[in-house]
């Protein structure tokens, strides 16, 4: 069997995402090779991707949402050089690909919501613009509580609600499991979900999530606004888990959904 000559792309992905899981890297490389076969071009270098970017994009038009999202993400990571300035052409390609991924993610979330919500949950479901209004109001009420030396039960819950909603407003929403298994103290970096600081950047590392056994750990960038909230919350929350019940234990997935509906 002939070994694929796409070392440059693989090395570039590793440079751009040094914390990438081997399983994710393998998936990305397989995706790039498969797209290359589909368009009849051997994609061996970053220049090849740039040269054939329109063919790559158009070849995925008829793909299902998840497949297209995974393949486009592979090309985005390959092109998104974190260490050197990128050309306007590459920046525009990345923007085009990212816009498509965002649309697909939104459609996927909407589809899963329509399929998975119970009738009771559908009654509690509110549009995104209303979520932002609720979040703005909650932020005004919660942020002063970070300055208090001690919190009563109601204040603690108010802050936790703010943290919880921040997870769904400041970054793309994830499943309940991703946060019920999230720890802020006594972290096992092989098994738990946790916050990782690396230089000036901060990440969420997910070891436990749907399909983690097949895909492996996921690492995502988080904005400074969310990082600051988590750090301040860690100072107020004496327990191991990011989100806890009245006994200081991790909350279940259904309970987390209940909390969201009550906010």
What are these regions (language model features)?
Residues 49-59, 195-208, 244:
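Generic recognition of long tandem-repeat/solenoid scaffolds
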Residues 6, 14-99, 222:
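Non-catalytic DNA-binding core/recognition domains of DNA-processing enzymes
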Residues 128-177:
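Basic, Lys/Arg- and aromatic-enriched nucleic-acid-binding interface segment
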Residues 71, 156, 160, 256:
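Hydrophobic (often cysteine-bearing) scaffold residues that line and stabilize catalytic clefts
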Residues 219-263:
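Active-site/catalytic core of tyrosine-dependent DNA strand-transfer enzymes
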Residues 181-224:
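Conserved tyrosine-mediated DNA breakage-rejoining catalytic core shared by Y-recombinases
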Residues 87-147:
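Flexible interdomain linker/hinge and immediately adjacent N-terminus
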Residues 37-40, 80-84, 168-173, 180-187:
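Hydrophobic/aromatic-lined pockets within catalytic cores
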């Amino acid at each position: 069997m002939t070994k694929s000559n796409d070392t440059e792309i693989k090395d570039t992905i590793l440079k751009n995402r040094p914390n990438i899981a081997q399983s994710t890297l393998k998936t990305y490389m397989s995706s790039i090779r498969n797209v290359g076969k589909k368009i009849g071009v051997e994609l061996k270098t970053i220049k090849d991707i740039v040269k054939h970017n329109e063919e790559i994009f158009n070849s995925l038009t008829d793909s299902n949402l998840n497949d297209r999202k995974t393949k486009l993400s592979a090309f985005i990571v390959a092109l998104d050089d974190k260490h050197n300035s990128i050309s306007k052409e590459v920046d525009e390609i990345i923007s085009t690909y990212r816009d498509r991924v965002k649309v697909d993610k939104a459609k996927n979330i909407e589809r899963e919501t329509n399929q998975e919500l119970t009738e009771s949950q559908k009654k509690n479901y509110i549009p995104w613009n209303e979520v932002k209004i609720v979040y703005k109001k909650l932020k005004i009420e919660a942020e002063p509580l970070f300055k208090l030396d001690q919190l009563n039960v109601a204040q603690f819950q108010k802050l936790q609600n703010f943290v919880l909603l921040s997870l769904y407003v400041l970054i793309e929403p994830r499943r309940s499991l991703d946060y019920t298994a999230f720890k802020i103290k006594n972290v096992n970096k092989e098994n738990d979900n946790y916050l990782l600081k690396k230089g000036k950047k901060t990440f969420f590392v997910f070891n436990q999530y749907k399909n983690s056994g097949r895909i492996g750990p996921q690492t995502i960038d988080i904005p400074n606004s969310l990082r600051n909230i988590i750090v301040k919350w860690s100072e107020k929350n004496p327990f191991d888990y990011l989100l806890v019940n009245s006994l200081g234990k991790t909350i279940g997935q259904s309970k987390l959904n209940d909390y969201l509906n009550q906010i």
